């Protein structure tokens, strides 16, 4: 059955789409349509959504549904009444929890919404509309560029695409992006930031070396509103329980 469905090695090495004539494109389209129909005939029910926890993982959070009731303690460590509006930087217990996970101090943590991607989008939108650090809003500039270690996370790149930001690819190696190239690029004042997934980088799984982290922290960009988007999404998502087999990226704040 697999031989009838999947593209053969010969097809995988086919001519690139841009080099095909109309006849070749029609022939390929017909073949792919036939493969699609064979997939449909299998009657599979597959959820192809990315990043969804399994039922077993969801079970881990079940006790959270029972930990708050009318008899629970509703005062935070600093006396904040958790039934009321929150405090700007977040509850101290939450800041301490995240600080421990990210190897930083609670004072370096601000609790925002539950979606880091939404926070990153909003930060770019704020830079676009009002500017950062008192600088000109990016929307009023002739050109805005972002450094994009590649391969990288497509949702980062989609944010740039949404705002019309020019993306500059920089090769991602096993120890992180090419710092020497980044140092050269940030001499351009139009370069406003860089996307980074520093630990188990999506999609290759690379972790930035200490040398790379220090190099990024020491950047002297021409743009005073240059920002490093340090999307450490996999800080606690280790593949192995054995600590000796786990990666721990250097704390860029230090």
Predicted regions and their residues:
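Short, Lys/Arg-enriched N-terminal segments with co-localized hydrophobic residues
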Residues: 2-13
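Short boundary motifs at domain starts and secondary-structure transition points
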Residues: 10, 35-38, 136-139
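N-terminal "arm"/small-domain region of PLP-dependent enzymes with the aminotransferase-like
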Residues: 15-89, 100
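Conserved core of the PLP fold type I
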Residues: 80-224, 235-253
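Residue-level marker for buried hydrophobic side chains located in beta-strands
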Residues: 228-229
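Walker B catalytic acidic pair
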Residues: 232
């Amino acid at each position: 059955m697999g031989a009838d469905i999947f593209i053969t090695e010969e097809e995988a090495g086919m001519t690139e789409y841009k080099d095909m004539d109309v006849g070749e494109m029609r022939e390929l389209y017909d073949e792919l349509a036939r493969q699609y129909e064979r997939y449909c005939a299998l009657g599979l029910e597959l959820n192809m959504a990315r990043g969804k926890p399994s039922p077993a993982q969801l079970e881990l959070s079940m006790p959270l549904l029972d930990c708050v009731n009318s008899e629970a303690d509703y005062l935070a460590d600093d006396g904040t009444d958790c039934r009321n509006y929150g405090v700007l930087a977040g509850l101290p217990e939450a800041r301490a929890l995240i600080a421990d996970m990210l190897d930083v101090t609670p004072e370096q943590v601000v609790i925002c919404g539950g979606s880091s991607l939404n926070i990153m989008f909003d930060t770019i939108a704020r830079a676009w509309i009002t500017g950062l650090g008192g600088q000109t809003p990016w929307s009023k500039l002739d050109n805005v560029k972002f450094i994009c270690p590649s391969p990288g996370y497509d949702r980062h790149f989609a944010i740039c695409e949404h705002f019309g930001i020019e993306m500059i690819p920089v090769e991602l190696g096993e120890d992180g992006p090419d710092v020497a190239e980044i140092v050269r690029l940030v001499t351009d004042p139009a370069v406003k930031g860089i996307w980074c997934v520093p630990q188990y980088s999506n999609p290759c799984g690379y972790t930035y070396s200490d040398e790379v982290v220090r190099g990024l922290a020491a950047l002297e960009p021409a743009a005073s509103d240059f920002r490093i988007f340090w999307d450490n999404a996999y800080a606690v998502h280790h593949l192995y329980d054995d600590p000796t087999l786990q990666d721990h990226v250097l704390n860029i704040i230090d």
